[in-house]
Amino acid sequence: ITTRLVGSEMCIRDRYTDSKTNARAGLITTDHGQIETPIFMPVGTLGTVKGVHLTELKEDIKAQIILGNTYHLYLRPGLDVIEKAGGLHKFNGFDRPMLTDSGGFQVFSLAGIRKLREEGAEFRSHIDGSKHIFTPERVMDIERTIGADIMMAFDECTPGDAEYAYAKKSMEMTHRWLDRCITRFNETEPKYGYHQALFPIVQGCVYPCL
């Protein structure tokens, strides 16, 4: 089964599905190469994986994809630097697929210095205390500028001990945020000549019914 993602040339194909467990092996095709799933994705919070040379990352670890963090990249080195370099791939020299998370977890972790509401999240930088606002639309614009192959939708990450009522309310807001992310994603174009895809995030805390 091959699924072509809306608004993108990227596609996902099932290579194998286990009939007993529904476990799947898949193949994601991007403009920067293919990703065999399930996959170990090294985390490069600021665009690079710490303690690992780029050559080792590609030739020894054989990383097919790495993750960058939208919140941290937005604050440092900043969007102007990344855009001037021609996107995150040019900035860090990694020519294989990349994914950026939405910054939702980082905003959640700033519980003492952020305000969360329907419009989005207002928070203060952990670096200098400056005030910033992340909305679904703003996050889409930021991820377009960063330029990863896979962009994650903006979501609220609830604490693991959240009560059911709050988890449900949060999940429903995450769904509304996803609708706004999709609208903004479809209103904008990639900046660097290759396709990007928008992936949603499943929320619901520890409650299977959600």
Identify the meaning behind each predicted range:
Residues 1-12:
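Single conserved hydrophobic/aromatic residue that forms the stacking wall/gate
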Residues 13-18, 22-210:
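Active-site entrance/lid segments in N-terminal catalytic domains of soluble metabolic enzymes
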